[in-house]
């Protein structure tokens, strides 16, 4: 029997952090909002910017730049907050420099990073798109790490 290639098309929201392009699985994205006043929370992690009130819902907001130890935040007119609502977890916002178009990437055009690779923690792979290469974020791992840090801080 011939090998059947997995030709499933996945959709990602294309975002920019500095000069780097990333993709966020569209199934996690609940909303994209303009940058607004973020209320700081005392004694929080450096990458935790604070909380916002979005239509009556208090949402924690993190800086992906700080989480990935990139250059400091440079909020500008194109900065946005990506509101993510993963299954069975609390809603969270990530500040990004820019939000681009929806990227359609075939499963066969994704080079997955091996689990032994240190980069694999927050990146699931690299997608090949007509507009260039895109690092695909592992949102589940990002949120799991955040929850683990909260638990450790509580103990």
Question: Where do the model's predicted regions map?
Answer:
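An acidic, low-aromatic, low-complexity terminal/linker signal
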Residues: 1-155
